[in-house]
Amino acid sequence: MKRSGGLFLTSLLLTVLACTLPTTAPIVAQAPSTLASALDPVAASAPPAPGNLAEPAADLAALYREVDPGVVAIWTFGSVDGAHETSVPLGQGTGFVIDTQGHIVTNQHVVADAEEIEVDFPSGMRAWAEVLGTDLDSDLAVLKVDVPADRLFPLPLGDSDQVQVGETVIAIGNPFGLSGTMTSGIVSAIGRTLDSERASPGGQPFSSGDILQTDAAINPGNSGGPLINLQGEVIGVNRAIRTESFTVSGDAANSGVGFAIPVNIVKRVVPSLIEEGHYDYPYLGVSSLSQSTLNLNTLERLKLPADTVGIYVTCVAAGGPADQAGLRGAGACENGDLLPGGDLIVAIDGHSLETFNDLISYLVSSTQVGQQIVITVLRQGEEVELTLSVGARP
């Protein structure tokens, strides 16, 4: 049967594993870690960053030895209708240690619907975990295990704002249950946008910005594992793959296009998940698209200048922050048709914006709920400044 391409979350359902691996004895996975002491750069017990070695192959071998102890395999269990056992395997993914207090970062979709969660460490140690908090928007979750601090190896967190296209990276995880697997590649692109795991009041999914794209092989089971630079720092959390390839059993297979949540989002979201169990995302209440994605015919129909970049507002949510501030949409809230009349957002607080990702990135990294911001829009050829109070995503 011919299958069309699509985007796949990379946790591994055990119905897939059952075709190739026994579910009675899960394969132990390696554990990465970082985010120590509420996101201090490196935990006290974190292994030192690998030195500069002469041979690239030796570099990667040393890097693996340093970071692998911080990567863990995550197994989820729950109830299934018709099952005789009280708890049956549901799925498997990857996570990494972020501090010596037992906090582990993974994807939200890895632990969704789990009633019990087992964490397997590279040393052979296993522990039950509890979920402290989840975030559907970023697809992040924080787990807590009761493990002695001297047996945890937190991974240092890097700075995803410094990531460059072409930079060499590695991914460590448990693809198809093969624990401790390392793959390497490069950062293929930065600033991608992915749909959130939840929908806005209008029915369209919220968006996650600043997503990293990599060609390092990411497959089912890699979800929640770290994307690591050559300095041994986590720069992203592996989340999804886009593929047109499938295994003989019908499962999505890697085709060189993987996506990772930037670590700077992790730094911002995870402390709130630990303390409060959730994170409130800044919210404007608009649907929009990058003007750069429109061709000349569309620009002329919408009466937009071809020499100005920005974010075209297609819809403004009634009663939302943008609506209260007087932002104008094109009235495409119901049918999604591209109509003229919407504002073109060109700046926030004096910072120029060119793409929809720029808008999402600025809101998440530079604003918080309740903050007053100034939005500059192009309206009928004139620049207009509007003051807006940032809301929280409903």
Residue spans for each PLM region:
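Acidic, Ser/Thr/Gly/Pro-rich low-complexity segments that form flexible
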Residues: 315, 319, 327-330
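Serine-dependent protease modules
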Residues: 24-309, 356, 364, 370-371, ...
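Bacterial N-terminal signal peptides that target proteins for export
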Residues: 1-9
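Surface-exposed loops/turns
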Residues: 318, 368-369
